[in-house]
Amino acid sequence: MPKLKTRKAAAKRFKATGTGKFMRRRAFHNHLLDHKSPKLKRHLKTKAVVDERDAENVRLMLPYA
């Protein structure tokens, strides 16, 4: 059986944790930040866990994660 290919776009966006969950960046922290509060920007810097309903699709894109 040939090796499975990793989706490179997904590999750049998601990171697997030790427990098998996936971490992702939060949206809305790229540009247009002037009107956003420091508290919100600080919160948007943190990583979020991918929802369990989306994790299966991420797992298929990252077979070796």
Swiss-Prot record:
Signal peptide, first to last residue: none
SUPFAM superfamilies per record: L35p-like
GO molecular function, one term: structural constituent of ribosome
UniProt-listed GO biological process terms: translation
Keywords: Ribonucleoprotein, Ribosomal protein
Presence of keyword Ribosomal protein: yes
NCBIfam families: rpmI_bact (TIGR00001)
Protein family: Belongs to the bacterial ribosomal protein bL35 family.
Protein known as: Large ribosomal subunit protein bL35
Organism expressing this protein natively: Prochlorococcus marinus (strain NATL2A)
